[in-house]
């Protein structure tokens, strides 16, 4: 009996120690699993030390700069600079050719001075060949460049040709029998120094984005072909007429307008083929009814 009591007495404290140790560690794990107080304190300490270092550095830099700032030279040089700028402003006259920076894209285009306000040191320029009027500072005007003007005029002409080609292709897509093999849109060889010129008001090609554009609503899908009154179509027709593919889009100028144009062209072609198929099926039904009556 003594041995059994001694054994049970010696075993109880071991079990109690084990249980107490497990409960303690379990509670501490559950309570500290989402506790990030130490991390927040470390972050705040690092930010505070960084701000303190920056503040001390700024004070040192400002004090160093104040000691080493050079003295200004006499105002004679400033007067000479003012004379040079005044002379450069006075050289422009109404009707002079120049090159100006268009505010829409920040590129240089040839222009002509329409009016000058010497008090405000501004002028109104008209971009050559396009009619866009814009107010510019006289100090911002550049000397005219003949080669740039020629390239801009040539690009504008090719730009108009591309817009004409796009309208021709949209008309050809409405007539099933026309072929578009002979229509080849020209790729505008833009100068690497300049983007396309600014556009005229209205639906035209935008500056800096060469290629075909799709402005306005899509063309309405054509109606299905009329019923052949007394003609019986063969049971296996040759298929729908050839539709010209949508105009190519330059991969360098892909944007929302290009994606929208491609979607509208696909929608238009899908509507045409759907109408053709529905008309063909209706012709087949009418032909079968006429044969059954006969």
From Swiss-Prot:
Residues 240-267 are annotated as: P2 (binding site for SM B). Residues 156-166, 206-215 have a biased composition (Low complexity). GO terms for molecular function: RNA binding. The modification Phosphothreonine is found at residues 25, 69, 85. It holds the Pfam family SMN_Tudor. There is a cross-link at residues 51, 209 (Glycyl lysine isopeptide (Lys-Gly) (interchain with G-Cter in SUMO2)). One of its GO terms (biological process) is axonogenesis. Residues 97-209 are annotated as: Required for interaction with RPP20/POP7. Homooligomer; may form higher order homooligomers in the dimer to octamer range. Part of the core SMN complex that contains SMN1, GEMIN2/SIP1, DDX20/GEMIN3, GEMIN4, GEMIN5, GEMIN6, GEMIN7, GEMIN8 and STRAP/UNRIP. Part of the SMN-Sm complex that contains SMN1, GEMIN2/SIP1, DDX20/GEMIN3, GEMIN4, GEMIN5, GEMIN6, GEMIN7, GEMIN8, STRAP/UNRIP and the Sm proteins SNRPB, SNRPD1, SNRPD2, SNRPD3, SNRPE, SNRPF and SNRPG. Component of an import snRNP complex composed of KPNB1, RNUT1, SMN1 and ZNF259. The Tudor domain mediates association with dimethylarginines, which are common in snRNP proteins. This is Survival motor neuron protein. It comes from Pongo abelii.
